[in-house]
Amino acid sequence: SDLMIRFECDYGEGAAQPVLDLLQKTNLEQTPGYGMDDYCDQARGLIRKLCDAPDAGVHFFVGATQANFTVVDALLKPWQGVLCADSGHINVHETGAVEATGHKCLALPSVQGKITAQQVRDAYDAHWADASHEHIAQPGMVYISNPTEDGTLYTKEELTDLSATCYDCGLCLFVDGARMAYGLASEANDLNLQDYANLCDVFYLGGTKCGALFGEAVIINNPDLDQDFRYAIKQHGAMLAKGRLLGLQFLALLNGEDGT
């Protein structure tokens, strides 16, 4: 082949063939819009089953930046910020999208892309120990990427420690899973989808960089946080009119050859 092989990113191709096949097979079907169709319902059900989280909220987004700033803005109070690695995507590679919603990225120094539960605890304690804490963005969430921006993986022990610290401090734990499929397939990985569902308030299973044309599936494991979340999706311009295109792609990716 005369096609150039490119290494600058992992999403230079279109999509896995089963995705294209299922989109073509269902192209002329008429369905309800905005993610309220049977295909999205099936995809939500399949994701809940894989996560062993029958009550989880599952919401489809077109892209990861869109998912990140919508989740952060919807879950935080106006005066709160999000603790993250200094190398974290929301801090350095999303053109200030989160901060454009009014929430400061509270960056912590990372080691190979990771932050620790102790760093979170120290940052939380330092905020409340400051006599001027009402003049400073209040930590309200912890954001991590897994795999990290450095290609490293959080272990189950590390994620468990982060989860416990967030629970103790009343912080939401949000995992950016744009490349989660890579991590799940790694021989070095000891986490599964059930672990993410048990340990995180919110995470997402990325499609855009993992075989879909586009699409991210946000899973919300806290029913209090899921309430009215669709209002936030719409307000942030993230509710796709032809929402079935997202559900279909996840069906194809998760079900196999023909998406059925």
Report each predicted region and the residues it spans.
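PLP-dependent aminotransferase-class I/II
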Residues: 102-140, 144-147, 154-161
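Conserved N-terminal alpha-helix of the aminotransferase class I/II PLP-enzyme fold
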Residues: 16-64, 86-91, 97
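Catalytic PLP-binding core of fold-type I/II PLP enzymes
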Residues: 154-186
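Conserved core of the PLP fold type I
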Residues: 55-76, 106-113
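General beta-strand structural signal in soluble alpha/beta enzymes
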Residues: 6-9, 58-62, 84-85, 144, ...
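Conserved PLP-anchoring active-site segment centered on the Schiff-base-forming lysine
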Residues: 74-92, 121
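Active-site C-terminal subdomain of aminotransferase-like
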Residues: 138-139, 153, 192-260
